[in-house]
UniProtKB/Swiss-Prot annotation:
Any one GO BP annotation for this protein: negative regulation of DNA-templated transcription
Organism of this sequence: Bacillus pumilus (strain SAFR-032)
Gene that produces this protein: codY
GO cellular component terms, semicolon-separated: cytoplasm
Protein name, entry field: Global transcriptional regulator CodY
Keywords, in A-Z order: Cytoplasm, DNA-binding, Phosphoprotein, Repressor, Transcription, Transcription regulation
The keyword Isomerase is annotated on this UniProt entry: no
Amino acid sequence: MALLQKTRIINSMLQDAAGKPVNFKEMAETLRDVIDSNIFVLSRRGKLLGYSINQQIENPRMKKMLEDRQFPEEYTKSLFNIPETSSNLDINSEYTAFPIENRDLFESGLTTIVPIIGGGDRLGTLILSRLQDTFKDDDLILAEYGATVVGMEILREKAEEIEEEARSKAVVQMAISSLSYSELEAIEHIFEELDGNEGLLVASKIADRVGITRSVIVNALRKLESAGVIESRSLGMKGTYIKVLNNKFLIELENLKSH
């Protein structure tokens, strides 16, 4: 298969993924097929975002790493010493992706390390490994292009997370600002009583203790529930079960108290 055709396969993977959640496993499989090697996509902290095996490596330690989806911390940190593509590292290299305890079995093992860069930051590392056949220029072009695509997807995922965080915070702030002074006071007492993300509340007890009407508590809870910040369920005489759905709510409530 020609280089241009292989590049187009990577392109189509990117186009197919547009707007969908990132699937690093599919990315690894595509790169495996076009480069004909084992592929490991690592995050900055060594989490295995995706991988695909072309040539099996029968080794208990490697098997556990794949199951745990985590590469050793020391190895991951050492990868940051490689600022640009480093190809055809042999079994004796500290960066080898082959188990050194089986050096005799993987004597012909070659590893290529490609930094994943995005927005000027090191986002992770793309590791390629195979037996015997050296990685040639075409392989390295595809690997670097693949790393760029992976970097773009990591950045997109991060941007979506930041957007979701901002949206959650805005919803909470709007919900809290819709509360009257007495309703806000009631909510503060309710969540002091719950002491966590969920629990059972007896509205009449809090109303008596704080000196507010039960209807103020009911209205406050209704406003938060309609905003999707909490969910509540009446359990009759036992009280009302409350669960926080938006993880920004308790943080914002705490911030209000400290001001």
